[in-house]
């Protein structure tokens, strides 16, 4: 979608853990755009600056739909002076925020037909479970079946946990939802809803046998718990999201810079490649069109094929071992290392 939607901030409020919730109204958006706004999905904020004034594109989770054109996003202040921090500092009621498109990989429809669902989230990754839980609560209030949900959260300190009152109320007033917070950097006594440290294997056993597991957090968090869940619940349907992009390779300050090129199998043309950037970033730098969305190895939109060459990749969340064996890769997770790396942009599944 190329149309830019000018969304108006209707209101905002602060949550714990340096999070601010913004309610945005997609003024003038057509039905096609509005139908893509889904709780648990993402919306693309386009051409919004960071503190250096450089326009950026960022994705934020939709945590609630209030009206067909009014939705909420939750944004965490990071202290890195990026787009999120700039939103915190500059957006007020009436501010205009440009949106490009919205998309969803996990929605309430993905999980509502299971008997039991487990959710694990770290930090701002709580936004995905919150969106899904709110939708399930709405279904439950209307008399519809919802799965039994267990939510495990990881936060450094008790004071960092957002939406805590809402979660407690839901736990104490329904028979289908329960949650537990694991506090990793504060000395606390264990009780019903709070445990010190990270979730142990015994904690995962308390999830019983979920039909589906939702994981959302940093890339490290999502990768770790994806592996643990796959090992413990091999039959469960897994939905994993990460809110941090793949890390670029770290080079020694004394290392000689390496040169690389990307060769295009379809045309035989080539471009110089920066080995500190992903293939996706290199293509964008050279104005070569490629479909992309999440930039985190989740959606699979930037799939391509690696024909040959020296490259490395960060773990993704959507390719199978068979895909990788057939040379498929995600441009956002793959980094050229040296020499010529031949790629086919129009990969077939």
Language-model segment annotations:
Residues 173-174, 182-185, 337-349:
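Short flanking/linker segments adjacent to small metal-binding domains or redox-active Cys/His motifs
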Residues 48, 102-103, 346:
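Short, surface-exposed secondary-structure boundary micro-motifs
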Residues 288-310, 323-338:
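Local cysteine-cluster metal-coordination motifs and their immediate loop/turn environment
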Residues 86-254, 261-263:
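FNR/FR-type flavoprotein reductase catalytic core
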Residues 257-291:
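C-terminal accessory/binding modules appended to enzymatic or scaffolding proteins
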Residues 2-96, 115-116, 155-157, 168-171, ...:
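Ferredoxin-reductase
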Residues 8, 227, 318-331:
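Low-complexity, intrinsically disordered Gly/Pro/Thr-rich segments
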């Amino acid at each position: 979608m190329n149309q830019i939607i000018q969304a108006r901030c209707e209101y905002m409020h602060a949550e714990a853990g340096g999070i601010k919730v913004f309610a945005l109204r997609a003024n003038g958006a057509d039905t096609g755009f509005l139908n893509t706004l889904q709780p648990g999905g993402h919306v693309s904020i386009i051409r919004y600056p960071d503190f250096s004034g450089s326009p950026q594109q960022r994705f934020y989770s939709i945590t609630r739909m209030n009206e067909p054109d009014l939705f909420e996003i939750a944004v965490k202040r990071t202290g890195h002076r990026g787009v999120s921090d700039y939103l915190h500092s500059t957006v007020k009621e009436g501010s205009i925020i440009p949106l490009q498109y919205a998309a969803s990989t996990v929605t309430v429809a993905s999980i509502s037909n299971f008997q039991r669902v487990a959710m694990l989230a770290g930090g701002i990754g709580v936004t995905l479970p919150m969106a899904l839980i709110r939708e399930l609560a709405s279904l439950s209030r209307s008399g519809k079946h919802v799965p039994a949900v267990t939510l495990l959260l990881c936060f450094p300190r008790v004071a960092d946990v957002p939406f805590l009152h809402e979660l407690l109320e839901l736990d104490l007033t329904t028979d289908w939802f329960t949650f537990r917070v694991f506090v990793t950097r504060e000395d606390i006594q264990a009780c019903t809803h709070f445990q010190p440290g990270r979730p142990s294997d015994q904690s995962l056993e308390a999830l019983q046998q979920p039909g589906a597991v939702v994981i959302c957090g940093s890339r490290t968090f999502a990768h770790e718990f994806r592996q643990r869940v796959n090992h413990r619940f091999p039959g469960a349907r897994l939905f994993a999201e990460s809110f941090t992009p793949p890390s670029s390779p770290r080079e020694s300050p004394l290392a000689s810079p390496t040169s690389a090129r990307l060769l295009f199998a379809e045309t035989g043309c080539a471009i110089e490649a920066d080995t500190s950037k992903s293939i996706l970033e290199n293509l964008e730098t050279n104005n070569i069109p490629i479909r992309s969305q999440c930039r985190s190895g989740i959606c699979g939109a930037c799939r391509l094929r690696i024909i040959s060459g020296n490259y490395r990749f960060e773990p993704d969340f959507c390719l199978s071992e068979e895909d990788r064996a057939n040379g498929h890769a995600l441009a956002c997770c793959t980094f050229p290392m040296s020499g010529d790396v031949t790629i086919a942009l129009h990969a077939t599944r």
